[in-house]
Amino acid sequence: SIADALIEHKDEIIKANNIDIEYGKEIGLTPSLIDRLTLGEDRIKGMADGVRKVSSLPDPIGNVISGNTLPNGLTVTRVKVPLGVIGIIFEARPNVTADAASLCLKAGNAVILRGGKEAINSNKAIAKIMRDAVEKVGLPKDSIQLIEDTTRQSSTELMQLSDYLDVLIPRGGAGLIKAVVENSKVPVIETGVGNCHVYVDKYADID
């Protein structure tokens, strides 16, 4: 399985990740961004555990959401089906490669991943491991694809592939999400930017 393969090849992932970390330091990434970029054994185990959790979820495909019978006797139902090919654009968090791919595969979709340049070596290592793993269980290797070109042009071109992509999901900061929403010809599922904080007054009743 993908989870087992990630654990088995953790040394390869860490080696590739170290290259990204050094590059990140060279270009002046903040300590918090370096932390997001870093993959140690614990985080790789966390990725594998996440894949296993997704795998253990009920199969969503084929579930009947609703239905009714028309006056002429015809029964109409709404059934969950795969979206098709999902594109995901994300930034310097290589764990997204495993998270996104496993979620897409679970729902019967193929995925095209486009990560940031800061994590390209980590992303390539993880994507290769996952592609090899799915092929071993009889799935098409290309059900998981990674765009290795990290220039702005590659993300711009991805946003224009309305004939090939069924939906595009940006995952990252407000700037990335805004750029995808405003420029994509592919339908976009707009995500939140994260970093949402809740302040709880010391006199609040938590219960």
Where are these regions (language model features)?
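Residue-level signal for inorganic ion chemistry
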Residues: S1, G108, L168
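N-terminal Rossmann-like NAD(P)+-binding subdomain of aldehyde/semialdehyde dehydrogenases
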Residues: S1-V76
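Short alpha-helical
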Residues: E12, N95, N121, Q153, ...
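A structured beta-alpha segment of the ubiquitous adenosine-cofactor-binding alpha/beta core
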Residues: G40, K53, P71-R78, L146-S162
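Conserved small-residue-rich beta-alpha loop and adjacent elements
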Residues: D49, K53-A133, V137, L165, ...
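Conserved NAD(P)+-binding/catalytic subdomain of aldehyde/semialdehyde dehydrogenases
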Residues: V85, L146-D207
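Short acidic capping loops at alpha-helix termini that bridge into adjacent secondary structure
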Residues: P140-I144
